[in-house]
Regions:
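Membrane-embedded segments
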Residues: 25-141, 155-158
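Juxtamembrane amphipathic/hinge helix adjacent to a transmembrane helix
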Residues: 218, 222-228
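Hydrophobic/aromatic beta-strand patches that form the interior of the parallel beta-sheet core
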Residues: 43, 84, 144, 171-173, ...
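Active-site metal-binding loops of divalent metal-dependent hydrolases
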Residues: 48, 148-149
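Juxtamembrane linker/hinge segments adjacent to transmembrane helices in membrane proteins
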Residues: 1-21
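Residue-level signature of catalytic and energy-coupling elements of molecular machines
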Residues: 19, 103, 129, 170, ...
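Short glycine-/polar-rich loops that comprise or flank the Walker A/P-loop
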Residues: 40, 78, 166-169, 219-221
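VWA/integrin I-like adhesion module and closely mimicked acidic/polar interface patches used
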Residues: 116-120, 142, 149-214, 218
């Protein structure tokens, strides 16, 4: 009996310790679940139409947009990120990943000639992004869309509807200025002049924020001025 009376408190203490460890394990497991649930999947949707070559912001709109995206990457920790580029059509150039170094390399390589068809088709952009979100739970789907908003196909309402159906929140960023600038025309990287209209007048491209604001506010996101 004497041995038992000595061992019993030790067993009791061990049992108590195991209980505490089990509780800690359970709680930290819950904490981990909470953290995992907070992970967002963010798709950068970047306008690569020719007007993004305009130099009304330094050095030019597309480069400013790329710099903004790289700044976004620096604020991210566990979020997954993918990249879609669009003009008159849209294409995915990077699948969702948490490899931010790879993402930066992809962003650096984007130029306006990656999409041939001109225009600014927000619906196609959202559709391609939605396709990438298929395996992602609806509360974690976010788009960061950067565009000058110009020459859009007038289908932002359809794009908003698609985003809402898919549970996607759009945060949009407008680049360019209200005064605008001419659109440089490059051939094999050489500046050949500026885009002209049928009457030979130089076309001035201006930032159009209305559609960008609707895309953000109507999907529960925010609109930001790329110049700030």
């Amino acid at each position: 009996g004497n041995v038992f009376s000595k061992i019993f408190p030790i067993l009791y203490l061990l049992g108590f310790l195991f209980l505490i460890l089990a509780m800690v394990d359970f709680l930290s497991g819950k904490e981990e679940m909470k953290i995992q649930q907070k992970v967002n999947s963010v798709i950068f949707v970047l306008d690569v139409s020719n007007s993004m070559n305009a130099e009304d912001v330094a050095p030019y709109r597309l480069q400013q947009a790329k710099n903004i995206l790289k700044n976004c990457l620096q604020q991210m920790h566990d979020d997954k990120v993918g990249i879609v580029v669009f003009a008159g059509e849209a294409q995915s150039i990077m699948p969702l990943t948490s490899d931010y170094t790879a993402a930066e390399t992809y962003i650096d390589a984007i130029e306006t000639n990656v999409v041939r068809r001109q225009g600014t088709d927000f619906l196609k952009a959202v559709e391609v992004a939605a396709d990438k979100f298929k395996k992602i739970p609806k509360g974690s789907r976010k788009i960061v869309l950067i565009s000058d908003g110009e020459d859009n196909e007038g289908n932002e309402k359809a794009a908003i509807k698609e985003a809402k159906n898919q549970g996607i929140i759009i945060n949009s960023i407008g680049v360019g200025t209200d005064e605008g600038a001419p659109i440089p025309v490059y051939v094999y990287g050489q500046l050949m002049g500026y885009k002209t209209a049928m009457n030979d007048e130089t076309v001035i491209t201006k930032r159009q924020t209305e559609a960008l604001m609707s895309l953000a506010y109507d999907t529960g996101g925010e609109y930001l001025d790329g110049n700030n």
